C-alpha cells in the first residue's frame, strides 16, 4: 500500500477551499444571459466551446491532490443537480461556493462546524418550502416556450421548438436531441408507436416511390416465436382475406417457406400483407410485444399463455388505423386499444422506472413509456460548424430538461430573484449562536446567483440587489438582457422551481460536508527511482581507427 499524506484542520480546509474556488470560478462565468463561454481543450479535434456548467465542471482536474478533492466534491454538486433536474448546474456551483466560503470563515472564527451545518440545513428546508409555496403552475404553451428560451440563453427559436414538441407528444413523450446534417435546426414528430424494425422483404412495399409499405385500417398479428411455416396460420389468414383488410405480422422472425408464401400472395394481390421482426431482445422483446398488444387491442400469441397459432381468431388480432413500414422503422398510428388498459400499462412502466437502479434500463423503460403515451419528437440541432452544433446542443439539452422540470413543479421569478426574496423570509431560529450563524450563512449565500448574474453582465451587483429588495412585489426583478426592471414572470424571465430547489439542496449538502471536514488523506506522489548507470564500454576497443 502506498504511503499517504495527511493534512489536518485549517491547512486541509484552505487547500480544499482553493480547489472549490478554482472550479467555481471557471463555472460561474457562464451564468446568466450575458454569461461568457468557456473553451475546453480536447485531446483530438477542435476545442469545445460551452456555456453548460456541468460540462465545464467535469473537465476540471487539479494537480494538487488536496485541492483536487475540494474541486471534485463541488463537481458532485453540479453532476447531481444535472442528474435530478437536468439544468441549474451553474447556479448549484455558485451556491456551493458561497456556502463553503462563508462556512470556512465561521469555522476559522472558532465556531462549531456541526452546529453550523445544522443551522444551514434548517434554513435550506425553510427556503425550499417557501419556493414550493410561491411556485406558479405552467398551463400554456407560451409559458413552456419562455422557460425553454431562458435556459437556452435567450434563444427564442429553441424555446418555441421545445414547446411545440411537448404539445405534440405530451409531457410524458420522449423528446430527443440530435445533431443535424444541415445548418438549420428542425423538429420532427413521430406520432403513434415507432420501433426500429423494417419490412422483411421489399416486395411488401406499397409505395415504390418512397419505398414504404402503408397499411390502412390493418389487423396486427403478434407472435413471440419464429414463423417458418404458415400451415397453422391458414385459418386466420383466410378470415382476414374475407374482411379485405390488410394484415401486419410482427414475430421474432418470418423466414423460409412462410416468407415466400406471404410474398407470393402479396404479389398476386390476394392478400394485403407485410411482416416485420419484433423489436428488442429477450425479456424486453416480450414486454414490447405486450405494449403493442395493449396499444392495438390485440393479444400476443404465446405458447406460455397456452395460445396456439391454429386457434387464433380475428378478435385476438390488434387493430390500427394506419401502419407505415419503411426499410428501417415501423410506425403504428391510432391503435384500437382501450384507454383504461393503456393508462394502466403506463402506470406500471412508471413504477418500474422508479424502482430500477440501472440507467440503461431506465432509458429503455422511458422509451417504452413514450411510445405508449403519445409519440416521439426529435429536435435536430444545426449549425455552421461542428463546434457550434455541439455548443448549441448543450443549450437545447438544458432547455429541454428545464422545461420538463417546470411542467413538473411550476416556476418562480428567474434571474436568482426567487432565492433573493427567500433570503429575507427566513425566520428559523437556531438553539445556539453557532446554529444562528449557519442560518445567516444561507441568508447571505442564496443572494450569490443574482449577484453573479449581474456581475457577469458588467453591472454593480450591490446596487441592483438593493433596488430589487426595496420593492415588495414577489416577481419584481432586473432583466439583465436589456438592463430594465420589471415584473419578471410577465417578461418571461422564469426559473423552474425544481431546478432552483435541487441546486440549493445539493449545494448545501456538499458544502455542509466540506465545512465539517477536519482531516484529508491523499496518496503521496511516487518518487522516481534514479536511472541505472550506463554500462561500461567494451574492453579492448581503445586505439581502434575508424
From Swiss-Prot:
Q: Name one GO molecular function term.
A: unfolded protein binding
Q: By its UniProt entry, which Pfam families does this protein fall under?
A: Cpn60_TCP1
The protein depicted here goes by the name Chaperonin GroEL
Listed GO cellular component terms?
cytoplasm
Q: How does it assemble?
A: Forms a cylinder of 14 subunits composed of two heptameric rings stacked back-to-back. Interacts with the co-chaperonin GroES.
Homology family: Belongs to the chaperonin (HSP60) family.
Q: Which reaction does it catalyse?
A: ATP + H2O + a folded polypeptide = ADP + phosphate + an unfolded polypeptide
**Which GO biological process categories is it annotated with?**
protein refolding
Main EC class the enzyme belongs to: isomerase
Subcellular localization is given as: Cytoplasm
The organism of origin for this protein = Brucella abortus (strain S19)
The UniProt keywords, alphabetically, are: ATP-binding, Chaperone, Cytoplasm, Isomerase, Nucleotide-binding
Chief site of localization:
cytoplasm
Q: What is its EC number?
A: 5.6.1.7
Which SUPFAM superfamilies does the record associate with it? GroEL apical domain-like, GroEL equatorial domain-like, GroEL-intermediate domain like
Q: Name the residues that bind ATP.
A: 30-33, 51, 87-91, 415, 495
Q: List the disulfide bonds.
A: none
Amino acid at each position: 500500500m502506498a504511503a499517504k499524506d495527511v493534512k489536518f484542520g485549517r491547512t486541509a480546509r484552505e487547500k480544499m477551499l482553493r480547489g472549490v474556488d478554482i472550479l467555481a470560478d471557471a463555472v460561474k462565468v457562464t451564468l446568466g444571459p450575458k454569461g461568457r463561454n468557456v473553451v475546453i481543450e480536447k485531446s483530438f479535434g477542435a476545442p469545445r466551446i460551452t456555456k453548460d456548467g456541468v460540462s465545464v465542471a467535469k473537465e476540471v482536474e487539479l494537480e494538487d491532490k488536496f485541492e483536487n478533492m475540494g474541486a471534485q466534491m463541488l463537481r458532485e454538486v453540479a453532476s447531481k443537480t444535472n442528474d435530478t433536474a437536468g439544468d441549474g448546474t451553474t447556479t448549484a456551483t455558485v451556491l456551493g461556493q458561497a456556502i463553503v466560503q462563508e462556512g470556512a470563515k465561521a469555522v476559522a472564527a472558532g465556531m462549531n462546524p456541526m452546529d453550523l451545518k445544522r443551522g444551514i440545513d434548517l434554513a435550506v428546508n425553510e427556503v425550499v418550502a417557501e419556493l414550493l409555496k410561491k411556485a406558479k403552475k405552467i398551463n400554456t404553451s407560451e409559458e413552456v416556450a419562455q422557460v425553454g428560451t431562458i435556459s437556452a440563453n435567450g434563444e427564442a427559436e429553441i424555446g418555441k421548438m421545445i414547446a411545440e414538441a411537448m404539445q405534440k407528444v405530451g409531457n410524458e413523450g420522449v423528446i430527443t436531441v440530435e445533431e443535424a446534417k444541415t445548418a438549420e435546426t428542425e423538429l420532427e414528430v413521430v406520432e403513434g408507436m415507432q420501433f426500429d424494425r423494417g419490412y422483411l422483404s421489399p416486395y411488401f412495399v406499397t409505395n415504390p416511390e418512397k419505398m414504404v409499405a402503408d397499411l390502412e385500417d390493418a389487423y396486427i398479428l403478434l407472435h413471440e416465436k419464429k414463423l417458418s411455416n404458415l400451415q397453422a396460420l391458414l385459418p386466420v389468414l383466410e378470415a382476414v382475406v374475407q374482411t379485405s383488410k390488410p394484415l401486419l405480422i410482427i414475430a421474432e422472425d418470418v423466414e423460409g417457406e412462410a416468407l415466400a408464401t406471404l410474398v407470393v400472395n402479396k404479389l398476386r394481390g390476394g392478400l394485403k400483407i407485410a411482416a416485420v421482426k419484433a423489436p428488442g431482445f429477450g425479456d424486453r422483446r416480450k414486454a414490447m410485444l405486450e405494449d403493442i398488444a395493449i396499444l392495438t387491442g390485440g393479444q400476443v400469441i404465446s405458447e406460455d399463455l397456452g395460445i396456439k397459432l391454429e386457434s387464433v381468431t380475428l378478435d385476438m388480432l390488434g387493430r390500427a388505423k394506419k401502419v407505415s413500414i419503411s426499410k428501417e422503422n415501423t410506425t403504428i398510428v391510432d391503435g384500437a386499444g382501450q384507454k383504461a388498459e393503456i393508462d394502466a400499462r403506463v402506470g406500471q412502466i412508471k413504477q418500474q422506472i422508479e424502482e430500477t437502479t440501472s440507467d440503461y434500463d431506465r432509458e429503455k423503460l422511458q422509451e417504452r413509456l413514450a411510445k405508449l403515451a403519445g409519440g416521439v419528437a426529435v429536435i435536430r440541432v444545426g449549425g455552421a460548424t461542428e463546434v457550434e452544433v455541439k455548443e448549441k446542443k448543450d443549450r437545447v439539452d438544458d432547455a429541454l430538461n428545464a422545461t420538463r422540470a417546470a411542467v413538473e413543479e411550476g416556476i418562480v421569478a428567474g434571474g436568482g430573484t426567487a432565492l433573493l426574496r427567500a433570503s429575507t423570509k427566513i425566520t428559523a431560529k437556531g438553539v445556539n449562536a453557532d446554529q444562528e450563524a449557519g442560518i445567516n450563512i444561507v441568508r447571505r449565500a442564496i443572494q450569490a446567483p443574482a449577484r453573479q448574474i449581474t456581475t457577469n453582465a458588467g453591472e454593480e451587483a450591490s446596487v441592483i440587489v438593493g433596488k430589487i429588495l426595496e420593492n415588495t412585489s414577489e416577481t419584481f426583478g432586473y432583466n439583465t438582457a436589456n438592463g430594465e426592471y420589471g415584473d419578471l414572470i410577465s417578461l418571461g424571465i422564469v426559473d423552474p422551481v425544481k431546478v432552483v430547489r435541487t441546486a440549493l439542496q445539493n449545494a448545501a449538502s456538499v458544502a455542509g460536508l466540506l465545512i465539517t471536514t477536519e482531516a484529508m488523506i491523499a496518496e503521496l506522489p511516487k518518487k522516481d527511482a534514479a536511472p541505472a548507470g550506463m554500462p561500461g564500454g567494451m574492453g579492448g576497443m581503445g586505439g581502434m581507427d575508424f
